Design a protein with these regions (language model features):
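A Zn2+-metalloprotease active-site environment signal
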Residues: 2-6, 17-269
Length: 269
């Protein structure tokens, strides 16, 4: 029975891998782990993070972040809007943020030192949510681990459902922590794509897309010419990125103004 389950799991993973097109027209190879299981792993990772890392006790920070998250989420495709998005603020001075499949968003308190108003915070959050809706986590797992690595992840799910023996058999040769999978650094192509998706999302939500430029200027200044903050470490060249954001912002101002005219006027802070 165990061998049959493992064979079925392996076959399902291989069959599920597929080529698709990203929001910017880039070819992606995805599907090593089915979406519902990615969502489950995202939720699991989020629970683990909240259990291991200190959460901010500042309720105004929590309310502020949730307000921005929900404003951005309202502009997502219907299937993503249907998810109950959840956010958390971690008591960590590093200017970092993330979003996970399954509708989970985490923000460090350190981000408030560089995201100095709600529009700049929206630029951070929309960028991270952009990774989720562009299936970048799925793409990274499929590319870096393939069916063999994904099988180790699914082994944990099989173990939870069918017994520890099945799970251990599936994960022979090592284990991959769900948290590690989801926090793998993105490629520069993915980061640029998340910029494009995120800047449009924030404009449609009624946040000024020009403030994305200010955010990145603040991030560069915060690095002090030394090693960039973790959030910047795998991202494209900062100056080139700012130039691209300025160009996009000009074309997105009408989208932002239309959103504001239609009543999308976030008042998160």
């Amino acid at each position: 029975m165990k061998k049959i389950l493992l064979a079925l799991a392996t076959a399902a993973l291989v069959a599920a891998c597929a080529t698709t097109t990203s929001p910017t027209g880039r070819t992606q190879y995805v599907g090593a782990v089915p979406q519902d299981q990615l969502d489950q792993l995202g939720a699991q990772s989020f629970v683990e993070m909240k259990g291991k890392q200190q959460l901010s006790s500042n309720r105004s920070h929590t309310t502020y972040v949730n307000c921005v998250v929900q404003a951005v989420v309202r502009e997502l495709p219907a299937d993503q809007r249907a998810i109950a998005w959840e956010s958390a603020v971690f008591a960590d001075d590093s200017p970092n943020a993330f979003a996970l499949p399954g509708g989970k968003v985490g923000v460090n308190t350190g981000i408030f030192t560089v995201a100095r108003d709600q529009d700049q915070l929206a630029a951070v959050i929309a960028h991270e949510i952009g990774h989720v809706i562009a299936r970048h986590h799925d793409e990274r797992i499929t590319r870096q681990y393939g069916a063999a690595g994904a099988l180790q992840v699914v082994g944990g799910l099989l173990g939870a459902r069918y017994g520890e023996g099945v799970g251990q058999a599936a994960m022979q040769g090592g284990s991959i922590a769900a948290q590690g999978l989801f926090l793998l650094p993105g490629s520069r192509a993915q980061e640029t794509e998340a910029d494009v998706v995120g800047q449009e999302l924030m404009a449609r939500a009624g946040f000024d897309p020009r403030k994305a430029v200010n955010l990145w200027q603040n991030m560069i200044a915060a690095s002090g010419g030394n090693r960039p903050p973790e959030w910047l470490s795998t991202h494209p060249n900062p100056q080139a990125r700012i130039s691209e954001m300025q160009t996009r912002a000009a074309s997105l101002v009408p989208v932002y103004e239309q959103a504001r005219a239609s009543g999308r006027r976030p008042a998160c802070r």
